Amino acid sequence: MRCSKTTRISILSATWLLTTAAASMAEDSLLKAAEGSSLKAAEGSLLQAAEGSLLQAAEGSSLKATEGSLPKAAEGSSSLVLKGVWLNENNYTLSRYQRVGGKGIHGGVDVRLGAPVRARGQPASNDWSLALLNLGLPANAARFTLDTRDALALDLSYREITQQLNNSGLSPFQGVEQLVLSDNWIAGSHSDSFDQGLINQPLNRALVRRKLQLEVSQRINAVWQMTSQIELEKQTGHRLNGMAIYTNAANPHGVLLPKPVDQQTHHFALSSLYNDGTTAASLGYHFTGFNNHFRALTWQNPFLSGLGTALDYPAGVGSYVSAPDYSTHQWLASAGHQLTNRIRLTLDGSVASTRQDENLIPLEEIDGRQADIDQPVDRLDGALRINTLRLAVLTQPLRRLAVNFRYGFKQRKNSFQRYAWPSIWGARNDTSDTDLRINNRPLDLEQDTYRLDANWRLKNRTRIQLRYDYLRTARNFAAVSLTREDRYALTVYLPGSVRLKHRLSLTMNDLAGSTYEWSRGFFQDFSTDLINQTPANQRWTNHPLLRQYSLSNQEKSGIQWLTTYQPDSAWTLQLKGETDWVNFDKSELGLTDVRDAHFNFSASYRHSSRLNSWGWVDYRASQRRQTGRDFLGGINKPANVSLPPYPQGSDPSRNYQTDQDNTATVVGAGLDWQFNQRLAVSSSYSWLHGREIFDIQANGARDLNGENLPNIETQLHSLDSQLRFKSSERLSLTLQHQYLRFADNNWQWQNVSLDAMRQVLGSGQRNPNDVIHQLTFSLQYRF
């Protein structure tokens, strides 16, 4: 089982730091660097779009409210809040980031304490505050601050948040890190042959994140200050992962599994700051340690895949290796000096080193016995080093004109050695061990960035901002080794009046790459023996056209418009529009065109000092066009081998095109009414409608039929109403009602049973169809 058995663990563990953990921790990964600015344009895969980012956008404030900066109790104020919450049903919409819990009645407490204030309004010499929020509820948090005003400042905080995704699916597997099937499991070649009564284990998809943070700042004198920060973060729970089962791409099968999550991240930072008004400097040290308590997931193959007794049920065991432990040390320094009244110079740099902190997982045979194959090393002793340098010259040659020059350098240096790692792709004697060895690729990168920008204020209230960036990126072990990008930006603040303001922004990016060496990956990954056995016209790991230019050649243009109008003291109107277009001008296959648009209109009206109302309309549209090419003949007729009348990879009649159009419309309105000094009400309503269209078209071949995928419709109604009553100066009551009506018809889950896809063991997850009522009663006492 390729990529799904224990024999692959050590290979994945050995290369993980090179491709994932260290890259994402120590700076942008090579893939991100190669993609350049196309990352934003191409980020939405079809699967991600089909899963629906609309829900995430609709509930956005839920996460923001929970994860946002913790409130600090006002100086001299203290309060106690008692909460009672009733929820009518369990759901995955309101509870995606749990703030309350499941169905039923829940209780919570908020406590806020603050330093006393002197009679004349002067605070005490030591200011402190304590906030304990949502005690007894899933999304609880706490914060303590202390400020001596003379020297010491301390900020200690803790927060906990639970993410509960749709867990209505079922699984036949038992266990946590070693998933096994029941003793009476009857395997089959397809999922519809399984006994559905044995698929009865809940599929847990909850994830809990806890974060503890301490920040201390000590002022030594008028110009020197020391700051330190410690942060501990722990994540536990499960994520849903799809795992593949196959050997040499033959007879593939798949399963959906709950992947355990149990990891800790430690951050420590120490810095020294100097600032005398003319010269500023700082020295700093950062440390990050990642500790993963879950190393590998194994599971029984539930299928009879025809891959041999060693790979099929019950002996076949698949495996997945998680991120290894690693540590990062970073040293930083910066300095700035005011050379003259019109010129300031700044310089900063950093050096970072990331190392893997654990030995590799032993390589094992597919039948579970210890493999008689030696690994080149038991531990990766190299390091990934990231060096940065930035220089800025800030000038103001004229009273209304500022001109700045900036230069940045980034170096990603990988000191890991290259090794040939043994790999067993299938049953014995499929190919010799020497032939199937895979080389790791220590990725290096160097990037130079130049920026020139100007800010010009004219006498007629017009302000013009111009910016030009040039990026040059060189990398090894990549099909495109060199990219150059020019970025232009123009922003104009148009003349208007005190009540009417306009802003126009234009951007254009041009990314160009060197020649796409499509065979480079084949020669760098595989052994010389395998290369010599492979015909010269078949030495490639990817189709020559599929990703040839899509990530390294593109033209992007964008426009933004903002108008704010206040016809009088009561009205405020705002109109905003923006659109982006990315043209992958040299792509024949793959992603070829991306268009995004966003328009927003909002209005607010202040009827009186006690009554405010507002409304808004928001529209978003995204269009992505991808082109694919179908191949005949399978493994014996590679796409780049000439077969009459065309080479398969060059026959345009076998093209097919996928157009993905996503739209989301939101309409909302709200009211805030203070009846009198004691009674106030507020209410807001929003309606969201989203549609995702997948249009598939064939290009002429008789045996290719373009059949569109079903549209995905998403609807959300949200109503939030509050009644606030102030009984006295110290006592107040709040009654809140939240109503949510959410439903979608996502075809990827709707009516997709456990055995709907014959070669994939699914989960039978249900689509959300929620009607949610939540009542919250709060009693606040100030003292």
Language model regions located:
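Bacterial N-terminal signal peptides that target proteins for export
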Residues: 2-11
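N-terminal signal peptide c-region/cleavage motif recognized by signal peptidases
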Residues: 19-21
